[in-house]
Each structure stands twice: as C-alpha cells, then as structure tokens.
C-alpha cells in the first residue's frame, strides 16, 4: 500500500455552466444520438475555449508556450476534445466516486491541491470530497491559479511544491 497520496486538481467533478446532473443527461443523450466516439466539440478542453485555452490551463504564458512547442515537435501527444461517450462516463464515474461511502474509510494520508478558479474540473466537488476523507489535507489556490497548478507562475508553483514536499516529508519520509 502507498504511504501517502497527492492529488493535484483532482477530477472529482467536471466544471459545467448547466450543472453536473443536466450535463450528464445531455452527454448521455448525445452519446445515444450518433457515433459515441465523435468529438463533443471542436478544439481542446472546453467548447468555445479556443482563445481562452491558456487561461483555462495556466496564467504563466511561458509555461503554456512550452506546451505548444512540444505539440509542434511531437504532434501525436496532442489530445483532441473528449467524445460524448467520454463525457457521459466522466460525469457518471465522478458522481459515483463522490457518493462512495468508502471515502470515509480511506486511512491513507491524502494531500489535495485545488484551484478554486479551475475552469475544467469542479473545485467545489473536490473540496467536498476532501471533507469526507478522514486523513486529508487541503491546500486551496484562488484566482492566482488555473487548472495546471504545477505549470503556474513561480509563486503558485513554489507554494504547491512546498506543500507537497512538507506533506511527503511528514507522511512518507
């Protein structure tokens, strides 16, 4: 068994403007209307996010540009948008995860780093799960951090790395 776990921007729910329940029903409907493997939208992480993709991921332009560099160098690593099937399963699995009574029995020390301004995953869901875990530490980041906490500007990244280092030193020396 692992001595400890660190979860960074954990996907315990997906961020959606229409609510998780409605979004799950919509994804299931769309999955059933055609090829379930077809892309749910064009682009990358979210519909309409093409111009705001960097803001969804990190406020650090140089770290974002580094990612773009690698996409150009190794195009096969670039992910496309999720399929309707992926979305339906993601909504269902995260809903079931959040409701799992075994969360309250996890003895392993867990550190959760959560970006409250995350535009991809539901930070409220992650914070809620952290409250269910008997041995969890929660480190919250505000507007200064987007989804990719470890690819953020140095002050955010440094705070995250310091929290991880202190946690692992204490829990898994």
Task: Describe every region a protein language model picked out.
Residues 106, 112-114, 118:
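Short beta-strand/loop motif that positions the catalytic acidic residue
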Residues 6, 111-113, 139:
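Hydrophobic/aromatic beta-strand patches that form the interior of the parallel beta-sheet core
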Residues 82-102:
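Active-site nucleophile elbow and catalytic-triad environment of alpha/beta-hydrolase enzymes
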